[in-house]
């Protein structure tokens, strides 16, 4: 197993970067994104243990969960590819910096929401992960991740608005 990943197309490698010693179908960046996203969610869940889901639609709740867990799995495991990788340096940079900016926005909105909860902030906290999953799916050309991100988006926003 190699610790070097190559970004490039049919005309040859465009760039070489060091990756983890994980199997090539695992996405170490996706693992980090999921772990970072979960930090404020776990803190919130521990502080609000008795909070109930106000969405009474079983269909919407199931749709959200299918989308959520599909995104979590596909952010970490690249299905349908023989290895994890990007089509170009640009894809990698968009993925890296776009994800970083969306995570930063997510953390900022969690801080703002923690200080004074509001519907608008809750909606931002629902939309940002959807955008993050969609960005990752498109830049990695992981079309199943794009599909699951859309399912999650519809379900998560509906649950948040209820």
Residues covered by each model-derived region:
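N-terminal signal-anchor transmembrane alpha helix
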Residues: 23-43
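Membrane-helix boundary elements
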Residues: 55-93
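Hydrophobic alpha-helical membrane segments
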Residues: 98-110, 118-143, 148-156
């Amino acid at each position: 197993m190699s610790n070097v990943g190559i970004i490039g197309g049919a005309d040859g490698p465009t760039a070489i970067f060091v990756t983890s010693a994980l199997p090539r179908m695992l996405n170490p960046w996706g693992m980090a994104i999921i772990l970072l996203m979960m930090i404020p969610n776990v803190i919130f869940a521990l502080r609000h243990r008795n909070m109930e889901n106000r969405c009474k639609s079983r269909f919407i709740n199931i749709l959200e969960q299918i989308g959520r867990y599909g995104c979590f799995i596909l952010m970490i495991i690249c299905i349908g590819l023989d290895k994890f990788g990007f089509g170009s340096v640009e894809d990698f940079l968009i993925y890296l910096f776009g994800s970083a900016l969306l995570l930063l926005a997510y953390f900022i909105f969690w801080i703002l929401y923690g200080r004074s909860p509001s519907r608008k902030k809750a909606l931002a906290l629902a939309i940002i992960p959807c955008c993050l999953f969609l960005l990752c799916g498109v830049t990695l050309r992981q079309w199943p991740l794009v599909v699951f991100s859309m399912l999650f988006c519809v379900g998560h926003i509906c649950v948040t608005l209820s």
